[in-house]
Amino acid sequence: NFVGLNEGDGFASVKMEGESWALSGDLDIIGSGDSLLIETGALTLSGAVSNTGNTRVAKDASLQLGDGEKTATLSGGLTNNGTVIFNQGSDFTFATDMTGSGNVEKVDSNTLTLTGKNSYTGDTVLHGGTTLVSTGATLGVKGSNATVTVENGATFATAGEVNNNIAILSGGTLAAWNAVQGNSTLSASGVDTINGNVTNGGTLLLSAADNSVGNNFTINGDYTGSDGSQIVMNSTLGEDNSPTDHLTITGSSFGQSGVSITNIGGAGAQTINGMEIVSIGGSSEAQLTLAKPVVAGAWEYNLYQHSDGNWYLESKATPSD
């Protein structure tokens, strides 16, 4: 059933119960409280919904924004105890604050930028496209065990506060902000930081799209790599203190990952202790290996784990012909 209470220039409240609803036009809701209530079934929006109150999605219901061709907008608050699905027809910025215990899915291939406070406690699955948590935005609740799953063909990056575990599947990418946003360099505290565990079955991309060097990606949790996973970095190959991208893991590391190094303008030099590229605060059990030879000038660099548990690029002179 569709129940709407009309009040002057718009609806005071809208309640939907049924199996499937599609709203392709614009809707003004001028009520308060849970003025848009999706009790059961699935509601797909492909127009502009202006809600002065709150939208609530019940446990067994779903709300889809966009129909794959058209883009939907939703203002007001959003309590998600069911499932919210993004299937927008174009790149989209979502500024609505989302709470609740429900799950979120992104199924389109466009870019979704989150700018609000997303404190829902359910899981998030990114099936495709790019998802960005912008500066000042949040995703997840501190101490939560919820997971963001980055599937094949999907990319996730943050300049805000992410309090979820991250599972990168084969073909998925967890990226540094400027690996996705070009030469956009930010210094906010949440940039390139995950407050949770990261399992990597795909790619952890630290290298900037503009070939700059010096990204520091931080995992405030454990890191687990699986066979075939990659960590991709830029370095200016030289002596110990030469610029390089860096991965900081405050917890422990497990499993295995390949490390791919792109030399950006380095001529090579003799290292003494080596260029630190990965630091680990807890138990350092992961096995990291170079994905391909790393050579600069007359110097070949190899990857070694030191007694501190951290990983370093160390150089040696290549044999002359």
What are these regions (language model features)?
Residues 320-321:
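Outer membrane beta-barrel translocator domains of Type V secretion systems
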Residues 1-15, 23-25, 33-34, 40-47, ...:
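Extracellular beta-solenoid/beta-roll
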